[in-house]
C-alpha cells in the first residue's frame, strides 16, 4: 500500500519546503560561476602586457649567439651606467624586449640583475622619461607568471607605483596605474597587498573629469581588479567607489563601459550589504539599459551584475524587476545571442524564480516560461541546466495555480527528460521540481481522488526514469527517487502503478493543449 500524506500535512510541508528550497535556489551556482570565470575573455584579462609595434628595420639583438651575448652585456652595462642618456637608452631596450607579444624573456631579464636598477629609476622625479620606461619594464614583468609578480613585489615596487600616481607626468601616472593593476590581478593576496599599500584613494583621484581617455581606461580596468576575487575587499572601499562607477557606466567609451561593468559585477558578487549599496547607488536602471547594448562584451558583465543582484534578498530582486528587466531577459532568451549570454540569462531568471510567488508571477506574466521550457528541451546542455534550475525553482516556490501553469507549458516533460543526464546536481534539482508538482497535485485532486500530475509524469516517460534512479550510485538521488515513487502514489508494494488507468479512464481532466511527447 502506498504512503500518502494528508492534504493538511502537505500544505504545511509545501510552505516549509518553499522557505528552505528558495534559499537553496537563490544560492549562486558556484560550479557554474567558476566555469565561466575560468574561461578566457580578452575584455576581462586580469593582467595586460603593454606592447609597442617596432619598425620593420628595427634591430634589437643579433641572431648570432655570440653577438647576442655581447649585446645583452652592453645593455646591462648601459643600465648601470652613470650617464642618464645611456640609462634611458638601455632601459628602453630592456623594455622593448619585455614587450614582445609572445614569450618575452622575462626570466632572463630578471636573472640579469637589472630589476633593482629599474626600481632606482622609479625614484628619479627629475627624469620622468626614465621613470616611465622603468615603470613600463616592471609592469610587463608583473604581467607574467605569479613568480614574476612576486619579484616586483619583493623589490618594493608597489609603494613606489602608488607614489607615482601623484606624478605631474601623465605617461608616468598611467604606467603606474597599469602596473598596480597587473599586481592586483595576480591573486587575492597581491590585490590586498596593493590595497594595503594605499593605492585605492589615489587611484580614484585618477578617475576625475579631466583624465585623458587612456588614463580613464587603465584606471577603470585597475579598479575592476581591486574588487576581483573572494573574500571581497573591506566594505568601506565599496562606499567610496560606487559614485565613481555610477558616472563611468554612462561613459561613451566601450572599454570604460566594459571594465566599469566588471567592477560592479565583482562588487555585487558578495554580501547582500554590497548588493544593497549597488542598488542605492542608482546604477540598476543603467545596467538594465546595457543589457540591450550592441556589444556582447558590454552586455555580459552587465548581465552578470544583474544576476548577482537578484541573487540577493527578495526586496533587492524586486528592485531589479521594477526596473523592467524581465522583458529584456525575454529578448536575451529568444534572440540570436551568444550561447554564454543565453546561459547567464537563464541563470539570472533562476534567481528570480527562487523568490516570492509575486516574483514568480512576474516571470510568468513576462511570458518567460515557454522560452525556458524550450531551452530546457532543445538547447546545449549548459543552457539546459540553467533553464531547469529556473523551472524547478518556480515549481518549488510557486502557488498551485502557478504550478498548474508550469504544467500547461509542458515543464513536466522537460524535468523528466533531464533525469538521464550525467550531472548529479541537476538530477536532484529536477527531482525536487517534480516532487513539488506532485505535492500540488495531491492538494488539487479531483473528485475521483486522482493526482493528475502523476499520470502526466508517466506519459512523459518520467516514471521509468525515476524507477531507474532507484539503482543510481548516488545515495541522495536514490533516496529521492524512492521517496517520490512511494509517497505520491506512483507504486504499490508489487511495483505497479496505483493510479494507472482503469477501463473507465484515469479520471483526470487534461488541459486542452496537446503534449508533444515524441521529441
From Swiss-Prot:
Chain segments annotated as coiled-coil in the UniProt record: none
Q: Where in the cell is it found?
A: Nucleus envelope
Query: Can you cite a GO biological process for this protein?
Result: protein import into nucleus
GO molecular function terms attached to this record:
nuclear import signal receptor activity
Can you supply one Gene Ontology CC term for this chain's record?
nuclear envelope
Pfam families from the UniProt entry: Arm, Arm_3, IBB
Where does each ARM repeat begin and end?
103-143, 146-185, 188-228, 230-269, 272-311, 314-354, 357-396, 400-439
Domain (IBB): residue spans on this chain: 1-58
- Swiss-Prot/TrEMBL keywords: Nucleus, Protein transport, Repeat, Transport
According to the record's subunit comment, the protein's assembly and interactions are: Forms a complex with importin subunit beta-1.
Q: What functional role does this protein have?
A: Binds to conventional NLS motifs and mediates nuclear protein import across the nuclear envelope.
Q: Which family is this sequence assigned to?
A: Belongs to the importin alpha family.
Q: What is this protein called?
A: Importin subunit alpha-5
Q: Which gene encodes it?
A: IMPA5
